[in-house]
């Protein structure tokens, strides 16, 4: 009879660390943000490293002995098109197979304010488990609500709050008006340019 075998776990040592590498520690998935090998004058060498929890986005500073072993995981990013939400789930379409998958809002969190229908998003997987959704780095949106600009407003003249079509509120230059299209950096939530 056929018996399922567990795949061998890929382990790496601290000597193999690279920024962006995926790790599984105590059942949670992380990516290495930065690391530093330290060789003090006395005592053994150690490694200081910063990892980011791929589910909640928190970063954690850690220290371990040089040569410590960790479970390495392959992080896979799939491009999917955001279609719509029905209130309970967000629906994405695989751009290669056209399969639609529902995603719980717990995977999206604060990033919901950058989701715009038909935009291509990055869905991050490890061990075939969805870890999170990243909107495009830049989105092109319309300003749906803001105070009107007035003659004499310049690029140097400060900013004002504006609501964009996704529902997010961002700071925009004083000269922009409702109905204008702009480009926004979703990583910082800042205005980039008028379109």
Positions of the model-derived regions?
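Short, Lys/Arg-enriched N-terminal segments with co-localized hydrophobic residues
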Residues: 1-8
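Acidic-enriched and Gly/Ser
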Residues: 8-165, 169-195
């Amino acid at each position: 009879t056929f018996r399922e075998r567990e795949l061998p776990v890929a382990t790496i040592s601290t000597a193999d660390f690279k920024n962006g590498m995926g790790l599984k520690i105590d059942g949670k998935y992380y990516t290495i943000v930065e690391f530093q090998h330290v060789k003090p004058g006395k005592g053994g060498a150690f490694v200081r490293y910063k990892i980011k929890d791929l589910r909640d986005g928190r970063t954690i500073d850690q220290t371990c002995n040089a040569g410590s072993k960790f479970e390495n995981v392959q992080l896979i990013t799939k491009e999917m098109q955001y279609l719509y939400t029905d209130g309970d789930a967000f629906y994405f379409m695989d751009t290669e197979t056209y399969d639609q998958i529902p995603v719980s809002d717990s995977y999206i969190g604060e990033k919901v304010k950058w989701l715009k229908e038909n935009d291509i998003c990055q869905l991050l997987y490890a061990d075939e488990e969805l870890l999170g959704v990243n909107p495009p780095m830049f989105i092109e949106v319309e300003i749906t609500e803001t105070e009107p600009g007035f003659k004499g407003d310049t690029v140097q003249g400060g900013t004002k709050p504006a609501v964009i079509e996704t529902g997010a509120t961002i700071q925009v230059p004083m000269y922009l008006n409702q109905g204008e299209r702009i480009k926004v950096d979703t990583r910082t939530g800042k205005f980039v340019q008028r379109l």
